[in-house]
């Protein structure tokens, strides 16, 4: 079949790769000049199968209230005259119910675990390198309440085959010695040796280059404007670019991987996708003392930040701001990243020359992504992965390719079906 994939972030590029593997004629449409120049550009770098706790949990409403008015709060809700934002917020509160929280966690775990397996197979088959490390992820807790809740979550994922181990402060230091200067901060941690890290941008651009060698066409610099519908099927994609002007592209099947912009494309044809942008920040810092810098990726639960080594750089990322589609850098939130990096690893990194970045992560209220077929039989979605797009990318891409090909995906997940 002829398939159009809309978007060349890590989700769209992996989708295109697996569609091509299954024999389809694939074209990817991307508004930027290369793959991975938007949401996948400078994320936290974690491939975190074990960290599946949704933002929407029974404690979340109280935490958000506590953080109101704090410019550097880990999760910041800025109310707007935006119906989509309020619909999202109300559904988020519903997803905080204990029964829904557990169901969502199991869905996230299923697709994340599967995706980790697919990524390992893909790396073995292609030999891709992307500043990847297989050293695990260590989640640090600075208060007893958070540590106790993490221990319960770790027990749940262990029941499903993920070896997330509860660690004392001393054991955390043994796993990652660069934490030793702040041992008195640490109440405990959880560690998953099977989790990985890597540069999502490098991975995506390398995979796109391989996909081109295998026949996938990437139409860069081309913006998707709208979808055409004929009867009960999508009949084309209206695009525009500087070179060709306006163009109508047609295919047998269409896969929308447009991150936070997915709802804007779908609403005119009557397809609802409750996805809202969660603005995240990162700072990339040069490593000045490699021996003092972490090699195990660290998640600081109190500040909702991650620290990931990517070659000779340390990526610090985190926070979520529900404030619309603006990409302006907030100095307070940027400085919070470098301040925390300095507190943990000040001797190891250059915090005076950070490279700041912000991107819009496509969040659903449940944190469960939207993967599968819409009410139009030839229109598929692969979006809504929130902070776990890198983690879920390979599994999501392969699953969508299976669905387009009429195959049953190899993972037990609640795929969309009309």
Where are each of the predicted segments found?
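N-terminal Rossmann-like FAD-binding beta1-loop-alpha1 element of flavoenzymes
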Residues: 2-28
